[in-house]
Amino acid sequence: WEGDAGLLHMVSDRGWLHRTRPRFEAEHLSGLSPIDSHRLRDTDGTPLEGSAADAESLSLRHDTNGKLGDTELWVSFERDHRLQRFRPDGTSLAAPIRPEQATGAAANKGMEAMTRHPEHGLVLGLESPPRGVAPKETRLFTLGDQEWRYPLAAPTGSALTELTADGNDLLALERAFAPPAPLVISLRRIRLGEPPELDIETLASFSSGDGWWLDNMEGLTRLSDGRLLLLSDDNASPLQRSLLVCLRPR
């Protein structure tokens, strides 16, 4: 969410950036207006394709400084595990960074979650336990030397899909997909302590078995007034949907 411009930035796992403007009526989400779309490009201007284009998470910089036009986008990628900075038009601003902490992540279980913390800077999370880490536990880390052990939620198949900052806390989105068990989406609060310690509180858990209209929720951002936007990935499947959901925490 870009507070200065009131725009929602989205990234696809096929290497596209999309800028949109959510529409609200009486504080309820009523629609989404597309603004523009751009291909992500490498440092030589070549559009990213194939496994190199598998973008997963997005974090903004200079998005709430009261100045339009200077927003930078940090994008994390799976399969070729790396981070890279871009302009909103998809132009690369720097060579990719390959964090050592992503070593051991499975090809499609890498840096799925990312946000900017006011004290720690960029905080990234691996979707699932990397090699050498206990089951049901994954890793949060900074680009420095800080690492935290993150215990995943109880539902079978839980995986970390996104992070967003909420003051000095983090909000985490998890998805549990393990058929024939119901699809479960969990929203959790994280308080980072002295690495590797942290405290976690589960704020809400939504199960398709209870009648909730859910899908593959992988995006999470916080609006300026505290409302949350959740976005699903349809996996390019005609059987799934891309959903945008607005929640207001109590």
Indicate where each model-derived feature is located.
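Sequence/structural signature of beta-propeller domains
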Residues: 1-250
